[in-house]
Amino acid sequence: MFCYQCEQTDRTGARPGCASAKGNCGKDSTTADLQDLLVHAVKGIAQYGAIARTMGVPDREAERFVLYAMFTTLTNVNFHAARFVALLREAAQTRDRVKAACEAHARAAGTAVPVLHGPAEWQPADDLAGLLKQAASVGIDAGLDTVGADIVGLRALVLYGLKGVCAYAHHAQVLGYERDDIYEGVDAALAFLAGNPADVDALLAHALDLGRLNLTVMELLDNANTGRFGVQQPSAVRVSPVAGKAILVSGHDLGDLHALLEQTAGTGIQVYTHGEMLPAHAYPSLKAFPHLAGNYGGAWQDQQSDFARFPGPILMTSNCIIEPLPQYRQRIFTTGPVGWPGVRHLEHHDFPTLIRAAQALPGFQATAPEQTITVGFGRHAVLGVADKVIDAVKAGQIRHFFLIGGCDGAAPGRNYYTEFAEQAPDDTVVMTLGCNKYRFNRHAFGDIGGIPRLLDIGQCNDSYSAIRIATALADAFECGVNDLPLSLVISWFEQKAAAVLLTLLALGIRNIRLGPTLPAFVTPGVLAVLVDQFGIQPIGDAGADLAAALARRAA
């Protein structure tokens, strides 16, 4: 295996990346290699998918499969090698179906039958050993000796950003929202990568194209979430348990949570959110369920201790699973793209087994003293008081805005974000999103003239809300986003964050501070380009970076 797609990748060798029997995320080499091969297979589907679309015979099920398959290869999503073997077989069958439709259309139209090469020609080996042999030649570092580390790193930037795009698009699709132009963009990016591009300018251009595509995808997901569950409202969320049977839901999928709330209504079971599910409490259609009891625990990297203490079953939706401990292995379930060997998997909102487990387990024996935090400051809530915010800026009551958000993780250096937020002066406002918020969301920030100093915008995909807030403020002040008293301090971990970063760059947003370390696939040569064109900076000392941000705006 060779993998350097996440922030926690091994950096102890001469070349950064996990290249042993097991990666730092817990992914074994077999699973890692099968994931590489699945990406290769999906490129073949996209090659024919792009042609099918121009012929007027698109295959919507194939397009949905591409999103799902790519999602399974994100960090901390699926560790189940057997499921990847099955997905590889399905990928070949899907590609052949799209290919056959293209050929049939060409023959009927009397035009040349398309003949494609590369991933479009791939056929799965008969057994696991054969599949692993195939995977050896299609990893992310394929061609390193020929094209060099910069080109391989840029290919990785495009691929990893695309993985994030596919994950967000899948979230929207399962809620019933999809768009042809998104599928077209995904196919185009995969087909581009299938050609093993080696031109720096073309790779950078495609990376920024993906950033623009991701903005469209995040807008669609925002429409999906608000269309299904209502507009986020500022809401107090209980973070201390109540007595009774309990289920914990982690991950990102609001549709799974809604289905579970419907199925547990009237059972006496309390449902709690964990990690990135916290913003669910701000959506009217979700918080209307009285047994959505609160949020339990912290960010994804705390799950082993959180889940071990939780007295009921756990449902993992979408990404962020890590190896289940023996203390809860028999009471954790996966759904959607998530998988772990030996863990029971539930499909299509089929939750009776999960509910029976909750009824059999003790639940919380007592109600703890109530503690709450506030969520729900999406763009509708913030822009609803935009006049008040603008007046506070003009009056000098608000000096600066900080967006401190993104993915959290366990690596050293992430306390930087806690220190930065807690040191922010009282005349500044901190906006946050993603699970990085757990670094400081219980700190008492107070308010400025009734405007909370901490505004929790939502999940990582709610970066769209943050962008809309920033552009609305820029319009109000008749300036560009880069001219606002606004600093972006971003914590990244995996491929969704890579997609969001590309979106920010595509919008021309400069001087982003990124950490706790820079992506391993961003080579010194590529970093020089990003610094020159976009002013990207690594994080340093929290106090010094804070002072620099305030000084730059004051100047």
UniProtKB/Swiss-Prot annotation:
UniProt keyword list: 4Fe-4S, Cytoplasm, Iron, Iron-sulfur, Metal-binding, Oxidoreductase
Broad class of where this protein is predominantly found: cytoplasm
Reaction equation(s) it catalyzes: A + NH4(+) + H2O = hydroxylamine + AH2 + H(+)
Names of required cofactors: [4Fe-4S] cluster; hybrid [4Fe-2O-2S] cluster
Binding site for [4Fe-4S] cluster: 3, 6, 18, 25
GO cellular component, one term: cytoplasm
Modified residues (Cysteine persulfide): 407
CDD domains assigned: HCP
Subcellular location: Cytoplasm
Similarity comment: family membership: Belongs to the HCP family.
Cystines in this chain: none
Protein name (record): Hydroxylamine reductase
Tree of life domain: Bacteria
GO aspect biological process, one term: response to hydrogen peroxide
Name of one Pfam family that matches: Prismane
Top-level EC class: oxidoreductase
Binding, hybrid [4Fe-2O-2S] cluster: 252, 276, 320, 407, 435, 460, 494, 496
EC number of the protein: 1.7.99.1
Cofactor note: Binds 1 [4Fe-4S] cluster.
GO molecular function: 4 iron, 4 sulfur cluster binding; hydroxylamine reductase activity; metal ion binding; peroxidase activity
Function (record text): Catalyzes the reduction of hydroxylamine to form NH(3) and H(2)O.
